[in-house]
Design a protein with these regions (language model features):
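Positively charged, low-complexity intrinsically disordered leader regions
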Residues: 1-27, 151
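Short internal beta-strands
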Residues: 33-35, 63, 173-178, 313-315, ...
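Glycine-rich phosphate/diphosphate-binding loop of Rossmann-like nucleotide-binding domains
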Residues: 36-55
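Short beta-strand elements in bilobed, periplasmic/extracellular small-molecule ligand-binding domains
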Residues: 53-66, 366-368
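ATP-dependent carboxylate-amine ligase catalytic core
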Residues: 67-135
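Acidic, Mg2+-coordinating active-site environments of NTP-dependent enzymes
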Residues: 88-89, 114-121, 137, 142-229, ...
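Nucleotide phosphate-binding/pyrophosphate-handling subdomain across enzymes
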Residues: 117-120, 128-141, 145-148, 159, ...
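C-terminal helical cap/extension that packs against the catalytic core
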Residues: 180-190, 195, 283-284, 327-389
C-alpha cells in the first residue's frame, strides 16, 4: 500500500473495488472522462469544458463535490460502495478514505445517470489522488500550478508539478498550462516518458480585447480557432487561461467530440463558477480567495477596476488562513473608498476588530467594523453607491453567507 504523509491512498482500492465496479453498468471503463488537475481558483476550466459539451447535446457531469446530488441518490450510492468497503476491511485491508468513498460514489451515480462525459477534478491533485483509479480518460488537463497543499505535494513548483503530472496516462493527450517554466518542464518530461501527446497553452496565445464589469472578450490565436473572439462572463483575467485550456481540450478531442464553433461560443459564454470572482448583483463581486495565489489574482483584477471607479471592500477570513499577509497584499496595491470587516466561520472565526487593526496598520484610510454579516453587507452596499464596485473577499464562508442573504432578500 502506498501512503502520502502516512495516509493510505487510492492505489490500494484500484484492484478490488474498481474490478467490482466494472459490473455496474461499466461504471469505470465506459464513461468518457476528462481528468483535470486544478486548484480552486482554476475550477472554471472544469465548468467551461462541461458547458461546451452540454451545448452539443451530450449528457455531461462534473466530479467536484456532492452539493448538487439529492439525498436519495447519494444514500443509494453510499450503500452500494459501503458493501465493497466492508469487504476490503474484512479481508484485512484498510477502509477507503472519505475522499475515496466520495469518488467511488460519484462513479456509481454517473453510471446510473447514463452520462456521456465526465470532467473529473482531482482532489489533492495528482499522483496519489483517488481519481487516478480511472484508467482510460479521453484527456488529461493540468491547470496552473502554485505553492498549495505544500505539506503533501512538495515545497517547490517543480515538486508539486511532479505530483500533478501523476494524472497523466500513457498515450492519452495532456493539455497543460505552460506559463511556469519549471512546472511545464516537469509535465513535458512526464508526458514524453509515457508517450502521451502534450499540448501547451500560454498567456501569449491569448489576447484580451475587452475587460469590463460585464465580462471579458478575448481571442485565442492558433491554427484551429484562427482569430475568433470568445466572450466569458468573468471579470478576472486569469479566467482567460482556464477558458483557453478548455478550448484547447475541445480542439484536441475534435475527432471524439463533434462540436460546431457556434456551440463552443454558446457554451463558453454560459460558463459559471460560484464564489470565484462571481458577480452576484450589479457591481457586486464575491471571491472566496483565501490563499496567496488566490489573493494575488483578486488584486490583479481589482487593480484594473480601481482605474475606472471607486472600490469598496467587505472582508473576513478564518483563523487557519494567513489573513495578515492577505491584508498587506491587498492594501499594498489597492486603494479603497471604504473597508468593512466582519466575522465568519463559527469556531474558526477571527474577531472583526483584529482585521480592522491590520487594515489600518496596512494603510487603509477608512475602516469600519460590523460584526453581523448581513448588516456588514448592507453597510458595504450603502457605501458602494451607484458609482462604485463592491468586492467581498477572504473566505468561502463569507461568500456563502452573502449569497444566502441575497437569496433571502429575493423572496
Amino acid at each position: 500500500m502506498e501512503t502520502l504523509k502516512g495516509l493510505p491512498v487510492a492505489n490500494a482500492i484500484n484492484e478490488k473495488i474498481i474490478e467490482e465496479m466494472k459490473d455496474w453498468k461499466g461504471a469505470i471503463p465506459h464513461l468518457a472522462i476528462v481528468r483535470v488537475g486544478e486548484r480552486p481558483d482554476d475550477m472554471s476550466y472544469e465548468r467551461g469544458a462541461t458547458k461546451k459539451m452540454e451545448k452539443v447535446g451530450f449528457r455531461c457531469t462534473s466530479y467536484t463535490f456532492p452539493a448538487d446530488i439529492d439525498n436519495d441518490t447519494f444514500l443509494k450510492a453510499f450503500e452500494k460502495v459501503k458493501v465493497l468497503a466492508d469487504e476490503l476491511v474484512a479481508e484485512g485491508s484498510y477502509h477507503p478514505t472519505y475522499f475515496e468513498m466520495l469518488f467511488l460514489m460519484g462513479m456509481v451515480i454517473f453510471a446510473d445517470a447514463g452520462v456521456d462525459y465526465v470532467t473529473l477534478e482531482t482532489g489533492l491533485g495528482g499522483r496519489m489522488d483517488a481519481t487516478t483509479a480511472v484508467e482510460n480518460p479521453v484527456a488529461c488537463v493540468i491547470t496552473s500550478i502554485s505553492l498549495d497543499h505544500m505539506q503533501y505535494l512538495g515545497d517547490t513548483v517543480a515538486k508539486i508539478a511532479g505530483e500533478k503530472a501523476g494524472i497523466i496516462v500513457p498515450g492519452v493527450p495532456v493539455i497543460y498550462d505552460g506559463n511556469d517554466p519549471d512546472a511545464a518542464e516537469v509535465i513535458r518530461a512526464r508526458a514524453e516518458e509515457l508517450g502521451s501527446p502534450a499540448y501547451e497553452v500560454k498567456r501569449s496565445d491569448t489576447e484580451v480585447l475587452r475587460n469590463t464589469s460585464a465580462g471579458i472578450d478575448f481571442a485565442f490565436r492558433n491554427e484551429y480557432y484562427k482569430d475568433m473572439v470568445f466572450s466569458i462572463p468573468f471579470i478576472a483575467k486569469y479566467q482567460v487561461m482556464n477558458s483557453a485550456l478548455a478550448l484547447k481540450t475541445i480542439e484536441v478531442l475534435q475527432n471524439v467530440i463533434s462540436v460546431s464553433m457556434d456551440q463552443i461560443h454558446v457554451g463558453i459564454a454560459g460558463t459559471r463558477w460560484q464564489g470565484r470572482m462571481e458577480t452576484v448583483l450589479p457591481g457586486v463581486i464575491v471571491d472566496g480567495a483565501h490563499n496567496e495565489d488566490g489573493v494575488e489574482k483578486f488584486v490583479e483584477t481589482a487593480e484594473h477596476f480601481q482605474k475606472e471607479c471607486p472600490l469598496t471592500l467587505l472582508f473576513s477570513a478564518v483563523d487557519d488562513k494567513d489573513y495578515t499577509d492577505m491584508i498587506h497584499t491587498i492594501c499594498s496595491r489597492i486603494t479603497f473608498r471604504h473597508v468593512v470587516v466582519t466575522s465568519v466561520g463559527g469556531y474558526r472565526q477571527v474577531p472583526a476588530e483584529r482585521f480592522a487593526k491590520l487594515f489600518t496598520e496596512a494603510g487603509a484610510s477608512s475602516v469600519e467594523v460590523v460584526e453581523d454579516v448581513e448588516k456588514a453587507f448592507g453597510r458595504a452596499l450603502e457605501v458602494k453607491g451607484d458609482d462604485g464596485m463592491l468586492f467581498c473577499v477572504g473566505s468561502l464562508y463569507l461568500v456563502g453567507e452573502i449569497k444566502d442573504v441575497i437569496r433571502r432578500n429575493k423572496k
